[in-house]
Regions:
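Active-site proximal loop and beta-alpha junction motif in alpha/beta enzyme cores
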Residues: 1-65, 70-174
Length: 174
């Protein structure tokens, strides 16, 4: 998210004071920003939380995303302590998947740092992915997908993603 080098970061919109915004307004703002994610911060409902958050892409709401979690936590730390602060602190963001604890380090003249703990681990879905459909989408042969006991699977810790093992590195280079 953040970097000490110009044009090297990953843009993120962080909207403070979103308590009065409706779902539709948040979605329209995310569409207007047209970034990969926009995170909206509201007053927390629980005293141990730093903020309640909602994460939107131009296409819809996400229950969790790492990029905005890190960005919002650093923005909260900078807002609370100033951009030139030299601190280590912890934020707790109330996200759709549950409370997300995020450790933040701010150092003057250096890129900010944050890391988080997920409230739940990724789980494998029972859904089966047809190799033919994957192969067609990837422009490869179905026989180039999977090897030994490694087969395509879907996982999720809030946002589903596919794990697609390829037969070898040459397939990935196509």
């Amino acid at each position: 998210v953040f970097t000490a080098e110009r044009y090297k970061g990953n843009p993120l919109a962080v909207v403070f004071g979103a308590d009065a915004l409706s779902d539709d307004e948040m979605q329209m703002i995310a569409i207007e920003f047209n970034l990969s994610e926009t995170i909206f911060l509201s007053a927390p409902e629980h005293v141990s939380h730093s903020a309640a958050v909602r994460i939107f892409t131009p296409g819809g709401e996400l229950p969790f995303a790492g990029h905005p979690t890190v960005g919002a936590s650093i923005a909260l730390a900078e807002r609370q302590h100033g951009e030139d602060a030299d601190i280590d602190m912890v934020t707790v963001l109330a996200e759709k998947i549950g409370p997300v604890r995020c450790a933040v380090k701010l150092k003057p003249g250096a890129a900010s740092f944050a890391e988080f703990d997920l409230p739940k681990l990724s789980r494998r879905s029972e859904e089966v992915i047809a190799r033919e459909k994957l192969a067609d989408a990837l422009g490869i042969s179905p026989s180039e997908i999977g090897f030994e006991n490694h087969v395509p699977t879907i996982w999720s810790a809030g946002v589903p993603f596919a794990m697609i093992p390829l037969r070898n590195l040459a397939v990935a280079e196509k």
